[in-house]
From Swiss-Prot:
NCBIfam families: PRK09450.1-1, PRK09450.1-2, PRK09450.1-4. It is an enzyme of class 4 (lyase). Residues 541-848 are annotated as: Regulatory. It comes from Escherichia coli O157:H7. This is Adenylate cyclase. The lineage of its organism: Bacteria, Pseudomonadati, Pseudomonadota, Gammaproteobacteria, Enterobacterales. Keywords: ATP-binding, cAMP biosynthesis, Cytoplasm, Lyase, Nucleotide-binding, Phosphoprotein. Its EC number is 4.6.1.1. Residues 1-535 are annotated as: Catalytic. One of its GO terms (molecular function) is adenylate cyclase activity. Pfam families: Adenyl_cycl_N, Adenylate_cycl. Transmembrane segments: none annotated. GO terms for biological process: cAMP biosynthetic process. It is found in: Cytoplasm.
Length: 848
């Protein structure tokens, strides 16, 4: 036994050193410096070292001895800066070990890869010590960033996985959605920079079910010494709950980094295919380590992942996705084989061998190596292919869950965050701008763009067509348009937000008298100045909250301009009484069309179009309906006006009206009932009534009707009935009301006799239930199951998706004030049994 253990330790150390050497070989000088010095900076704590802060900061890594590079750094500090290096006290030190995980040291590591560092610490650190260590790690992240290196630290309590603790969504630890799978990835990819060896590697795979007993036997026999090993626990069986949560998390990540996520998503799918006895990849690697089979390029975890996914896709004869996953792997490795290199490193040798086995020709290599120059056609094809592959994975996951009648373990809050991002990215709506380039190609800019308008009555459908070429008849006729929409605003937005339209693009337009080139150029300039292309990704808090308008542009008279009729005419009006909404003797409205372009807090870009005399009223009602009363005001609201005449007056008046209405909608005096705005448009009076849950519009024909409407709103303040006796909603519920989603608010009763429930549907209609008894968790489960039968779906290509899950909140009192917080529970509950007749479309069971 002793000899066997010593042999294993030697193999472990050899593999670890191989990975360290490979990691350093793939790094630039700054990366190497950060990678090499991190253990030293965590072991010591001194004002002359990066990461220093005042306080009793935990320092010291168990079993740490500086290597030559680290000793040289310490000697320089001591020699040239007078630093006296003091070793931490003897005994068990606070930091158990420092490990990289992920692609670092694998064939998937590139010069642009970031570093994910696990700092494993003793469970006896108190809350203050953990906070200080976290602050030090944040300072070290900033120091690394100053050198151009992206590092992310994750503090890991050595007992975390034994107690099934979870972090928060938004970091690499994936909130409550992963546990065993996160440990699986750590065990197969970890590289020890300093500290204790990982105990799990010493336990044979056939003893995994008796992991703790086997470890205690090794300790009792004196074969291993407990304080020399990091023990995060064994890899128990994979629960369906965790599997589903991890799969959602991978889809979440795939939105921003599709090539990177495809391989991991398919690995999870392979696990489900092997259920109920999935061969976790970490166990496979460990088995080969124990057998002495140092294969697959030195047990490279990235190559092993590709090998497992290849086995699975070949077994189910899915060669389309197999080809895709190989291309994703090739692009992730980022070794351009079509270009000669003087030095052939190990990563290039690995990729060359694989490409030869796949039978790829030079043309395919050249196409992939030219990814930096891909334009819209190639990018859109790649985007659709990646999306189809992801959707296929999730259809398979849903079938797997239904077949096994398994449940969903992610908390409602995490599910809400995940599904909101999916909803924002994949929901297809007529006015929504689809972003097709999530890190696929760095530059989609086009030198020429032509916008062509086809009027009604022609062979082609009426509307606007976009081409990425100059308006040469032969080239236009022989090519399909890039995009079509009934309205110009949507096409300009699509071209701008997808990066085709830049300041260097030459614009052409054939507008048939609707829009000319100067007007188009002016609009493009306004949009580009008002809407930045890149913004930080929405936070989990933003995704869990109702979406709010962040940047809003109101585009007036772009496609229809009533003032164009003034040309060569004498128009009589009193300048002192000028009203652009009821202008002149005929009381014409000078706003003929309104286009809305806005970006919301989920980073969706939406467009809407309104035509005719009532376009201003309709646009106002739409804007205000998308603002719940507790929403923050938009960061910016701009009015762009393209009228031939009276442009400044129209723009100013619209700006004033919009600002006044937004102020009324979001006003802190929301408890006052009967707030309204009267507006005269084309000689008719309209009333905008700012009610508790929405904004209604009513045409007021005469004085009696006008005052009657005002009186009604003063009396009731609601356009809907709450129960039969007009029960008043709590103010915090009013403020959180948001159209388009179903919201449940739980409130504890003052006499502790059950709880109250306030339910707002997509149109903010209200139901109230008092003194409810029973389990809130069961209610959440039942509601989720109920909405899984909804038929409201949206489509993306051939895929049906519905991510609009009801949202659950708890009303609490903090310092005497009512607040709304997300409702948290451990489980949504069991899924309904499988329907054997039909496969439910993607995520339909969970997110209907």
């Amino acid at each position: 036994m002793y000899l066997y253990i010593e042999t294993l330790k030697q193999r472990l150390d050899a593999i670890n050193q191989l990975r360290v050497d490979r990691a350093l070989a793939a790094m630039g000088p700054a990366f190497q410096q950060v990678y090499s010095l991190l253990p030293t900076l965590l072991h010591y704590h001194h004002p002359l070292m990066p990461g220093y802060l005042d306080g009793n900061v935990p320092k010291g890594i168990c079993l740490y001895t500086p290597d030559e590079t680290q000793r040289h750094y310490l000697n320089e500090l001591e020699l040239y800066r007078g630093m006296s290096v003091q070793d931490p006290p003897k005994g068990e030190l606070p930091i158990t070990g420092v490990y990289t995980m992920g692609s670092t040291s694998s064939v998937g590591q590139s010069c642009s890869s970031d570093l994910d560092i696990w700092v494993c610490h003793q469970s006896w650190l108190d809350s203050e010590e953990r906070q200080l260590l976290q602050r030090k790690c944040s300072l070290l992240e900033s120091w690394a960033a100053s050198l151009g290196v992206e590092v992310s630290f994750f503090l890991i309590d050595e007992n975390r996985f034994r107690h099934n603790e979870s972090g928060s969504l938004g970091g690499e630890d994936c909130g409550s959605t992963q546990h065993i799978l996160l440990l699986d990835e750590f065990y197969r990819t970890a590289v020890r920079l300093a500290g204790k060896r990982i105990l799990w590697n010493m336990v044979p795979c056939d003893e995994e079910e008796h992991y703790d007993d086997y470890v205690m036997t090794l300790y009792a026999q004196g074969v291993l010494t407990p304080n020399e090993w990091l023990d995060l626990g064994g890899l128990s069986s994979l629960s369906a709950e965790e599997y589903f949560g991890a799969s959602l998390w991978q889809l979440y990540k795939s939105i921003d980094s599709p090539y990177k996520a495809v391989l991991k998503t398919l690995l999870l799918e392979a696990y489900s295919w092997e259920y109920p006895n999935p061969r976790l990849l970490a166990k496979d690697i460990k088995q080969r380590l124990h057998d002495g089979e140092i294969v697959s390029f030195g047990l490279d975890p990235y190559c092993m992942m590709l090998e497992r996914v290849t086995e699975y896709l070949t077994a189910i004869e899915d060669f389309t996705r197999l080809d895709l996953v190989r291309r994703c792997f090739y692009l992730k490795v980022c070794e351009k084989l079509s270009r000669e290199r003087a030095c052939v490193g190990w990563r290039r040798a690995v990729l060359s061998q694989l490409v030869s086995e796949w039978g790829w020709d030079e043309a395919r290599l050249a196409m992939l190596d030219n990814r930096a120059n891909w334009k819209i056609d190639q990018v859109r094809e790649a985007h659709n292919e990646l999306l189809d592959a992801m959707m296929q994975s999730y259809r398979n996951l849903i079938r797997f869950a239904r077949r096994n009648n398994l449940s969903v373990s992610a908390s409602p809050q995490d599910i809400g965050v995940l599904t909101r991002k999916l909803y924002a990215a994949f929901e297809a709506l007529p006015g929504k701008v689809t972003l097709v380039n999530p890190q696929i190609s760095p530059d989609l800019s086009e030198p020429n763009l032509t916008f062509i308008y086809v009027p009604p009555g022609r062979a082609n459908r009426s509307g606007w067509y976009l081409y990425n070429r100059a308006p040469n008849i032969e080239s236009i006729i022989s090519h399909q348009p890039l995009e079509y929409n009934r309205y110009l605003n949507k096409l300009v937005a699509w071209a701008w937000f997808n990066g085709l339209l830049t300041s260097r693009t030459r614009l052409y337009i054939k507008g048939n008298g609707i829009v000319d080139l100067p007007k188009l150029q002016e609009m493009v300039a306004d949009v580009s100045h008002h809407f930045p292309l890149r913004l930080p990704a929405p936070t989990p808090k933003a995704l869990y909250s109702p979406c709010e308008i962040r940047h809003l542009a109101i585009i007036v008279n772009l496609e229809y301009d009533p003032t164009a009729a003034f040309r060569n005419q004498v128009v009589h009006f009193d300048f002192r009484k000028l009203d652009v909404f009821s202008f002149g003797e005929n009381q014409n409205c000078l706003v003929g069309s309104v286009d809305l372009l806005y970006r919301n807090s989920w980073n969706e870009v939406r467009t809407l179009h309104f035509n005719g005399e009532q376009s201003m009223i309709e646009a106002l009602k739409t804007i205000l309906g998308k603002m719940h009363q507790d929403a923050a005001p938009p960061d910016s609201v701009e009015v762009f006006c393209y009228s031939q005449h009276l442009r400044g007056l129209i723009r100013t008046r619209v700006q004033q009206l919009v600002s006044e209405c937004i102020e009324l909608r979001l006003s802190s005096t929301r408890q006052e009932t009967g707030r309204f705005k009267a507006l005269r448009v084309s000689g008719q009076t309209w009333g905008l009534f700012f009610e508790r849950l929405n904004v209604s519009v009513q045409k007021l024909e005469n004085a009696i009707e006008f005052y009657g409407a005002i009186s009604h709103n003063k009396l009731h303040g609601l356009s809907v009935q709450v129960e039969t006796n007009h029960v008043k909603l709590p103010a915090v519920v009013d403020g959180f009301a948001s159209e388009g989603i179903i919201q449940f608010f739980f409130e504890e009763t003052q006499d502790e006799n059950g709880f109250n429930i306030y339910i707002l549907d997509e149109s903010n209609r209200v139901e109230v239930y008092h003194h409810c008894e029973g389990s809130k968790e069961e209610l959440v489960r039942d509601v989720s199951r109920f909405y899984s039968s909804s038929h409201d779906r949206f489509t993306y290509g051939s895929s049906f998706i519905n991510f609009n899950l009801p949202q659950f909140y708890q009303i609490v009192k903090v310092d005497g004030r009512e607040q709304v917080i997300p409702f948290r529970t451990k489980s949504i509950g069991n899924m309904p049994p499988a329907n054997q007749d039909h496969d439910t479309p993607l995520l339909q069971q969970y997110f209907s």
